[in-house]
Amino acid sequence: MKKIIAMAVVAAVAVSMVCAQITVGAKGTFGMNLGSKVSDEAKVLFSGNDDAKNAFMVNGGGSIYGRYNLPFLPALGVQLEFGLTANNGAGLKVEYEGVEMTATASYLSLDFPLLVTYDIPVGSIMITPMVGINFSVPVGSPKFVFKTDENEAAMDMGDLKDTGFIPGIVAGVEVGIPVGPGSITAGLSYVNDFTPVKLKSDGFDEKVDLLTRRNFNISLGYALKF
């Protein structure tokens, strides 16, 4: 009897796996730092003033993803993404020897969001709220730019090798419009990292907390369901 029950459970799971709805897609993103915080240590390092005001920056990137919906809960899904985001960062409005300038720090990251999604059909349009965790990994060296109305200069001030994985949360909503064999997707999302990227600056023995990323993103892509 136990064997029969076990076989029935395995068969039910197998059927569910086979019949599950799978979505794959790709999207490009464009956004800005909205709430990204430069640490007081970094403000002093770049401007000599921990009261320097933050400045806006824009970022861009793209990702591929897969979403898995079970037949007995067709609206509920789990989505795994792999993304690349360029120009994460923040800026400071500073004054140096009477000259006003903007100092920006930016970096490239690999992002791995794991999301719970919920599909809400509205006519032929699909609205999908989503929320989940994100793990980010800084890649390469950060870029530092000092810009005035007349000049712009880039500087190498260290690396982010000691940062490691950065945990965070991401939430948003996506709208899918059927076009051809799949759907054009447009979305809004907000990424909030929990810990800062750490700068190992030349000439300093200790690591410096550089900034904590908080990005608002707009996306446009295409998805196929199987």
What are these model-derived regions, one by one?
Residues P167-V179:
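Conserved C-terminal beta-signal and adjacent last beta-strands/turns
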Residues N59-Y65, D111-L115, V170-G172, N217-S219:
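Membrane-embedded beta-strand positions in outer-membrane beta-barrel channels/transporters
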Residues C19-N69, A223-F226:
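Short glycine/proline- and aromatic-enriched beta-strand/turn motifs that initiate or cap beta-hairpins
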Residues M1-T23, F226:
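Cleavable N-terminal export/targeting peptides
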